[in-house]
From Swiss-Prot:
Residue segments, region Disordered: 129-151
Keyword vocabulary terms for this entry: Ribonucleoprotein, Ribosomal protein
Protein name per Swiss-Prot or TrEMBL: Large ribosomal subunit protein uL13
Entry GO terms, CC: cytosolic large ribosomal subunit
InterPro entries assigned to the protein according to its UniProt record, in alphabetical order: Ribosomal_uL13, Ribosomal_uL13_bac-type, Ribosomal_uL13_CS, Ribosomal_uL13_sf
Biased composition (Basic and acidic residues): 131-140
Species in which this protein is naturally found: Trichormus variabilis (strain ATCC 29413 / PCC 7937)
Family the UniProt entry places it in: Belongs to the universal ribosomal protein uL13 family.
Length: 151
């Protein structure tokens, strides 16, 4: 009978990464971020434990989408009251709350349970180029979202 490997919690080293979202494709960027938050890039990945790293996303206001998604992609939210459905296009939400676009995309790629909520707290998204996490000494992470392009 095989036994699931459990890495000791003391040995888990959580790194901090900073990702620049300028001109990056939203979905491809979000899937890479979700993989790092989950810890799938590490040798001691365990599905039911939080083994991932922290990710800081800067320049969320400059994230890119392809095709007509800028005008046709809709984000919906509901207040819980009758007739309380609010609909907003990608372009309007990007003007109003650019962080929410990246957060929404990454959250959809994480587990839909308590572990997913815990992983989501390790994502920090900022609209502009600055962030308040310099004390953590984050490493620059370059994510190539354009297939075949060198970066």
């Amino acid at each position: 009978m095989s036994k699931t490997y459990l890495p000791p919690q003391e040995s888990l080293e959580r790194d901090w990464y900073v990702v620049d979202a300028t001109d990056k494709r939203l979905g491809r960027l979000a899937s890479e971020i979700a993989m790092i938050l989950r810890g799938k890039n590490k040798a001691h990945y365990t599905p039911h434990l939080d083994t991932g790293d922290f990710v800081i996303v800067v320049n969320a206001e400059k994230v890119a989408v392809t095709g007509k998604k800028r005008t046709q992609k809709l984000y919906r939210r509901h207040s819980g009251r009758p007739g309380g459905m609010k609909t907003e296009t990608f372009a309007k939400l990007q003007q109003r709350l650019p962080e929410r676009i990246v957060e929404h995309a990454v959250k959809g790629m994480l587990p839909k349970n308590s572990l997913g909520k815990q992983l989501f707290t390790k994502l920090k998204v900022y609209a502009g180029p600055t962030h308040p996490h310099d004390a953590q000494k984050p490493k620059e992470l370059n994510i190539n979202t354009i297939p075949g392009a060198e970066s």
